[in-house]
């Protein structure tokens, strides 16, 4: 009977220990890798850090980048920000929103752009607002231009015998619809739009790169062409040739960080502690399965 009670007690203690260790591990992962829910802000904010914000893919919205910029702007432990750019461009308005936000942040802390494979068009628009631009010799950048591509399918429609009835209020409401060819007035309107946006692009790059490239020189190459990183450096479109870690060093120097800086990426937002626990548990299971799979793959095959 005593042995039975001892076994039950021992099992209970072991279960408690497992629960406690799991809790501590989850909590440590929580503070290390994920964003803290409300109530924990300010805890463990230490050291001189550099915030890394990825800008990837086609730029169609500014929301995520703006949110990350604001977070890093407010964190006192973040001394500088690096935008890790790998984007061929996108739409102009989101680029302008990000450009304006970087202008504000630069009054408080330095912002550096690190171009990986490509940082062209709207992505270069964003980069031009930073304190420094770092890229590799073979990176693709520049492409200061505006393009509108409007398919004209009216001949196809006529060929297959489809009639398109247009009801509109406003003479140019169906401009660029593709179901009819552009007339001269419509083409002039669209050209005027593209030219205006192009001038906005050029003007902002001139402002962002002030003192680094002459306006006349910039205008002469702001014709939509793209450049290698090395050519862009020679022209004054970027500041230095280097990789991601070189950009971090530049940011650290500008931010007054001595020694090896600690880097921080945007954290994933958790709606509840349960979400955090479930995510941590699922990651542990996946890692366990990966380990088991590796062990099996390395095992000798019977012959």
Regions found by a protein language model. Name each.
Residues 118-122, 140-144:
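Short gly/pro/ser/thr-enriched loop/turn and capping motifs at secondary-structure boundaries
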Residues 1-113, 117-119, 130-136, 149-303:
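N-terminal organellar transit peptides
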